[in-house]
């Protein structure tokens, strides 16, 4: 049974100055991190800040797995932030995310509540937890034209080499899904090599970091099941609606994964079966890249406390309780 006295004490301690100013819950897709964050927020009277690079877009609901029902626990609405904050078709970035995060984080702290950062976008998470100093990167048309002449495989290798020079991974996992996104990631990386110091000037935020570790085969099973559920729930119709709103196919393809493959199906590039097969493979690869990123975060000095995803929710909450 959860210790209600502990949670009352902790809620008071938040306003009095505990050592952690935030809890971070991260994990790969289909690990159950959002539901864990919501239940924890329920017990702590906390608020959730999303760290998902695609859930920021309005109207991209099924494909990004917003699962807003997770934010209701025992009939109580859990406040969440940085979801549905910009229009589909636009191109949000990690620099904007840092600014939006700080605004929301400060507002939550002003109310003496605890922010819970939750998501699986490694770049966004690390930009907050490591406090990267970022600036806007202007388009470099000459560089883009040069890169467009190269194969996608060569571009990915170039991006890897840039990351090695920067000694970090300043790109999103989905930046490898399309040539356009990889080119933009290279453009940002080259700018950072000459213009920016990726270290810091972002406020240090002490955070307890929890990782949800799901068995590989269970993760694969859940990904496959969830993909078919989303198709049944109208994911193709969602993408058609976005296209009917005037969003260009290439702009949806830019977002990668579901929006890339479903759009290619709608415009006739892929059959339905090809779309499902290729999308399923891509999501499995994406989840693997997420875990690779999180392990890289640990190598770069970020301590992640891993919790087994198969544990009952009550046990997960109690384990987090012992770490606070």
Regions inferred by a protein language model and the residue ranges of each:
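Phosphate/pyrophosphate-binding catalytic cores of soluble transferases and nucleic-acid-acting enzymes
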Residues: 2-324
């Amino acid at each position: 049974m959860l210790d209600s006295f502990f949670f009352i004490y902790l809620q008071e301690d938040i306003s009095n100055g505990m050592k952690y100013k935030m809890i971070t819950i991260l994990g790969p897709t289909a690990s159950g991190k959002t539901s864990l964050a919501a239940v924890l927020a329920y017990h702590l009277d906390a608020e959730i800040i999303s760290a998902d690079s695609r859930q920021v877009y309005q109207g991209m609901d099924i494909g990004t797995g917003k699962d807003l029902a997770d934010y209701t626990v025992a009939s109580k609405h859990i406040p969440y932030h940085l979801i549905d904050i910009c229009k589909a078709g636009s191109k949000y970035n990690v620099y904007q995310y840092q600014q939006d995060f700080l605004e929301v984080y400060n507002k939550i702290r002003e109310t003496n509540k605890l922010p819970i950062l939750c998501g699986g976008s490694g770049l966004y998470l690390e930009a907050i937890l490591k406090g990267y100093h970022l600036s806007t990167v202007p388009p470099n048309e000459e560089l883009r034209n040069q890169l467009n002449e190269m194969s996608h495989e060569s571009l990915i290798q170039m991006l890897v080499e840039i990351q090695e020079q920067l000694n970090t991974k300043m790109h999103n996992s989905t930046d490898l899904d399309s040539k356009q996104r990889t080119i933009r990631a290279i453009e940002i990386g080259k700018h950072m090599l000459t213009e920016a110091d990726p270290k810091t000037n972002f406020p240090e935020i002490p955070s307890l970091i929890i990782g949800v570790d799901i068995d590989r085969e269970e993760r694969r099973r859940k990904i496959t099941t969830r993909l078919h559920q989303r198709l049944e729930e109208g994911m193709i119709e969602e993408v058609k609606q976005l296209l009917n709103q005037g969003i260009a196919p290439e702009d949806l393809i830019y977002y990668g994964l579901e929006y890339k493959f479903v759009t290619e199906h709608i415009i006739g590039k892929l059959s339905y079966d090809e779309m499902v097969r290729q999308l399923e493979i891509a999501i499995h690869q994406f989840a693997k890249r997420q875990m690779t990123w999180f392990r890289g975060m640990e190598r770069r000095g970020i301590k992640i406390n891993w919790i087994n995803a198969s544990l009952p929710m009550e046990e997960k909450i109690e384990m987090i309780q012992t770490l606070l």
